[in-house]
Amino acid sequence: MQRTYTVTIPSFEPALTVFMLVKTSPEWLGFPVERRFALLEEQFTPILRKHAAHVTLRFFDVEFYATRVTDLWMWDARDHHSYQLLVEDLRETAFWDRYFEIVEILPGVENAYARNYGRPAINA
């Protein structure tokens, strides 16, 4: 069964972007691919839907280029509280430090330096 997933573009101006560096666990890799997608659909997707008005996620696979982490989860949040509520829900699942080790969390604000000085953002 082929599933289709789409990238959600935030319908809001993110106040916060968080880069979550994660590493798959041997338990996760031990599941057949279909089971992994079923677990995502059962446990992860409902949380994404619950918070969709305030938080969006983009997945990046980095295992081809890095050894410390296998994936990067990029969260855009409308505000800090929305991100905190999302994390509280994720922590109640096996995806948080069981199926995926949360290696590092890097929060940031896009173009804050330019904004703080009333300058236009430098973009390529």
Curated annotation (Swiss-Prot):
InterPro entries: Darcynin. Belongs to the darcynin family. This is Darcynin homolog.
